């Protein structure tokens, strides 16, 4: 009887330990666009202590369109889940806007940007703002740009607007590091009218994007590249790929695995080098989209994002 009681006690203790170690945080969306993550910070491999991170800060401003929103939708939640503090992530976006249009709005300085800021794990709208309002709202470490998707593989559409935007941004903050989100190719069956720029061929579009970004790096000196497009293309070769090829409409990213993988890529590129903690082991999940982020899907997205970023930067911290 005594041995039996000891056995029951051991079972009970094991059960309590397993309950305390699960630490899975799941995003339960109010709808497919707005998400309300919980506040669990458990389960992240190598989570830094408050003493490790309280002296470090990072401020990221993303300028773009709906592809920008796809890229960073889950980034604040991933950062919070990792137990990382003192990170400000902001986005100033206009749907379907190209570098040419951003340059025009920067010159006119009209109140057309949908501006949102996250300091605690979720974006909060600041309403319509001018280009200058957004830039002057904080002292940004990184300002991330991108081209509109249909022109992302056509470098001739980047200039002179990209160089002009860089000069304008540096007139506000000379020390800001300019970065670039490499966007993704459309699905093979995409109906986007801009797909004709690439003969309605995903491979041609993908390779054109790679070529354009390489030319941009050479001509502008931009070295901080967020290789979202490579990560999405790699995932399309795995068993989680679907008819829409990780998009929700042939071009915007799926609300589940697509957006999650993109945010993992941003995390590995910008967050890891500063805070010395990677995405691998992050317990954030997303029960949305055509490819929900289960434990298996999350691990795959994390591993591919980590590997792609390491390979892109030659296994060095960017």
PLM region descriptions:
Residues 15-54:
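Bacterial Sec-dependent N-terminal signal peptides
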Residues 70-158:
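Conserved SGNH/GDSL esterase-like catalytic core that processes O-acyl groups on lipids
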Residues 1-5:
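Positively charged n-region of N-terminal signal peptides that target proteins for export
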Residues 7-17:
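Bacterial N-terminal signal peptides
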Residues 61-63, 92, 181:
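Short hydrophobic segments within beta-strands
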């Amino acid at each position: 009887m005594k041995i039996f009681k000891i056995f029951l006690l051991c079972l009970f203790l094991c059960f309590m330990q397993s309950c305390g170690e699960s630490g899975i945080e799941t995003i339960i969306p109010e709808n497919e666009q707005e998400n309300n993550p919980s506040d669990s910070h458990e389960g992240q491999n190598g989570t830094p202590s408050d003493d490790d991170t309280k002296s470090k800060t990072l401020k990221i401003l993303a300028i773009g369109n709906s592809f920008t929103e796809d890229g960073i939708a889950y980034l604040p939640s991933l950062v919070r889940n990792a137990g990382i503090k003192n990170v400000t992530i902001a986005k100033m976006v206009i749907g379907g806007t190209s570098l040419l249009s951003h340059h025009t709005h920067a010159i006119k300085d009209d109140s057309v940007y949908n501006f949102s800021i996250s300091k605690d794990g979720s974006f909060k709208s600041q309403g319509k703002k001018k280009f200058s309002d957004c830039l002057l709202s904080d002292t940004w470490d990184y300002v991330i740009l991108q081209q509109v998707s249909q022109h992302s593989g056509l470098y001739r559409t980047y200039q002179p607007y990209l160089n002009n935007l860089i000069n304008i941004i540096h007139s506000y903050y000379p020390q800001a590091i300019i970065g670039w989100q490499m966007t993704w190719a459309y699905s093979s069956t995409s109906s986007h009218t801009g797909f004709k720029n690439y003969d309605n061929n995903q491979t041609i579009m993908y390779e054109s994007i790679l070529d354009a970004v390489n030319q941009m790096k050479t001509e502008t000196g931009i070295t901080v590249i967020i290789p979202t497009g490579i990560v999405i293309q790699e995932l399309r070769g795995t068993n989680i790929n679907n008819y829409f090829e990780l998009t929700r409409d042939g071009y915007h990213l799926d609300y589940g695995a697509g957006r999650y993988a993109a945010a993992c890529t941003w995390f590995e590129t910008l967050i890891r080098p500063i805070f010395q903690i990677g995405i691998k082991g992050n317990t954030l999940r997303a029960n949305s989209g055509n490819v929900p982020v289960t434990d298996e899907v999350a691990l795959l997205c994390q591993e591919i994002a980590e590997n792609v970023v390491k390979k892109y930067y030659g296994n060095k911290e960017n």
